[in-house]
Design a protein with these regions (language model features):
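Structural detector for short beta-strands of small beta-barrel domains
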Residues: 1-8
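Short aromatic-glycine-enriched beta-strand elements
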Residues: 11-15
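Short, Lys/Arg- and Gly-enriched loop/turn segments at beta-strand edges
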Residues: 46-51
Length: 51
Protein backbone atom coordinates (compact mmCIF):
# COMPACT_ATOMS: atom_id res chain seq x y z
CA UNK A 1 0.00 0.00 0.00
CA UNK A 2 1.50 3.35 -1.03
CA UNK A 3 1.28 6.49 1.10
CA UNK A 4 2.68 10.02 1.31
CA UNK A 5 3.93 11.88 4.38
CA UNK A 6 1.74 15.00 4.57
CA UNK A 7 2.79 16.45 7.95
CA UNK A 8 5.21 15.88 10.83
CA UNK A 9 4.37 17.02 14.36
CA UNK A 10 6.83 16.14 17.09
CA UNK A 11 7.28 12.37 17.27
CA UNK A 12 4.47 11.61 14.80
CA UNK A 13 4.03 11.76 11.05
CA UNK A 14 0.71 11.95 9.27
CA UNK A 15 0.54 9.74 6.19
CA UNK A 16 -2.15 9.66 3.52
CA UNK A 17 -2.80 6.32 1.84
CA UNK A 18 -3.19 6.70 -1.91
CA UNK A 19 -5.73 3.94 -2.49
CA UNK A 20 -8.20 4.97 0.25
CA UNK A 21 -7.40 8.62 0.97
CA UNK A 22 -7.29 7.83 4.70
CA UNK A 23 -4.88 9.88 6.84
CA UNK A 24 -3.17 8.04 9.71
CA UNK A 25 -0.86 9.13 12.52
CA UNK A 26 2.34 7.04 12.66
CA UNK A 27 5.18 7.19 15.20
CA UNK A 28 8.39 8.50 13.60
CA UNK A 29 10.28 5.55 15.14
CA UNK A 30 8.40 3.21 12.76
CA UNK A 31 9.43 5.14 9.64
CA UNK A 32 12.74 5.12 7.73
CA UNK A 33 15.43 7.44 9.13
CA UNK A 34 15.42 10.96 7.72
CA UNK A 35 11.80 10.92 6.60
CA UNK A 36 10.40 14.30 5.48
CA UNK A 37 7.11 15.81 4.32
CA UNK A 38 6.35 14.76 0.74
CA UNK A 39 8.24 11.46 0.92
CA UNK A 40 6.49 8.46 -0.62
CA UNK A 41 6.38 5.23 1.37
CA UNK A 42 5.30 1.66 0.83
CA UNK A 43 3.61 -0.11 3.74
CA UNK A 44 4.01 -3.87 3.47
CA UNK A 45 4.26 -6.63 6.07
CA UNK A 46 3.78 -4.05 8.85
CA UNK A 47 6.89 -2.11 7.73
CA UNK A 48 7.34 1.22 5.95
CA UNK A 49 9.90 1.51 3.14
CA UNK A 50 10.82 4.64 1.17
CA UNK A 51 10.10 4.45 -2.57
Amino acid sequence: MLCTVIDIRGDYAFVKYQDTGVVSEVAIALLPFGIDVGDKLKFENYEFERV
